[in-house]
Amino acid sequence: MSGHSKWSTIKRKKGALDAKRNKIFTKLIREITIAAKIGGGDIESNPRLRVAVNKAKVANMPKDNIEKAIKKGIGGNEGVEYFEITYEAYAPYGVALMIKCLTDNKNRTSSDVKSVLAKGGGSLGTPGSVSYMFYRKGLIVYNLEKYLEDEIMEFALEVGAEDILVSNNEAEVITSPDDFDKVLSFLKTKFKEEVAEIALIPENKISLNKDQAEKIILLVEKLEDFDDVQEVIHNLEIPEELS
C-alpha cells in the first residue's frame, strides 16, 4: 500500500504557507459561503458545507470567521454571485490538471488560467479530455510523525475504508464518497487529520525527474496564486526529495 503521494494540492513549505494564510482563508471562506448558499447552513444535513468547515478547522481558521461565512451564505442572493468552473488542462510532460475555480467573472478567470498555462508550457483541454483520468473518493490524511501506521490502518479498515496508502510520512485513508462521513467521524475519535475531503483521485500517476517535477510544481503554484482558483488537482507523482 505504498508508492503514492498526496492526492490534492501540492504541499508547500511551512513558511510559504504562513505567508499565504490570508489567501488560503479567503478561498476557504468563499467555499463555505457557496456551500451554505446552495445547501443551507446546517452542517449535519449539508455534506458539502461539512467538508468545507472541516477544511477550515484543519487550517486553524477562527470559529468566528467560519460562522460569518455560513451566515453570509444563507443570507440569500445579496452581494457578489459566484460561479463554479472546473478547467481541464495539460501541463508539460503529459501531466493532467483539474483546475477548480469559484469566480464572479468567468471571462477574467478563463483569461488568467489560459495565460498561466501558456507561460508554463501547458494548455487548456476540452471538456472530458482530462476528467476521465480521475475518480471521486473520500480522502483523509494523517501525519505519521504523530500516529502509528498500524493503528490508523486497523481502525480505518475496521470502519469501512477501502484502502490506506502510505508515502512520505503520511497515511491516506481512501473511502467511497458514501462512506466518507462515517469513516471520518469514527477516526476523529482516535486521530486528528491533516486533510479530509471528497477528492478527485488520479487513476494513474506520472513519474518525472526532479527538474521536470519542479516545473510542474511551479505551474500549479502559479495557478493557485489566483484568488479564483480554489484547488489544482494533478496526477504527478511528486519525487520524495520535493515532498
UniProtKB/Swiss-Prot annotation:
Keyword RNA-binding annotated: no
A Pfam family recorded for this sequence: TACO1_YebC_N
Keyword entries, A-Z: Cytoplasm, DNA-binding, Transcription, Transcription regulation
GO molecular function: DNA binding
Recorded GO CC terms: cytosol
GO biological process: regulation of DNA-templated transcription
Top-level taxon of origin: Bacteria
Nucleus listed as a keyword: no
Leader sequence segment: none
Transmembrane segments: none
Location in the cell: Cytoplasm
InterPro entries noted in UniProt: Integrase-like_N, TACO1_YebC-like_2nd/3rd_dom, TACO1_YebC_N, Transcrip_reg_TACO1-like, Transcrip_reg_TACO1-like_dom3, YebC-like
Sequence similarity: Belongs to the TACO1 family.
HAMAP family per record: Transcrip_reg_TACO1 (MF_00693)
Matches recorded under NCBIfam families: PRK00110.1 (NF001030), PRK12378.1 (NF009044), YebC/PmpR family DNA-binding transcriptional regulator (TIGR01033)
PANTHER family, per the entry: TRANSCRIPTIONAL REGULATORY PROTEIN YEBC-RELATED, TRANSLATIONAL ACTIVATOR OF CYTOCHROME C OXIDASE 1
Protein name: Probable transcriptional regulatory protein BB_0025
Species whose genome carries this gene: Borreliella burgdorferi (strain ATCC 35210 / DSM 4680 / CIP 102532 / B31)
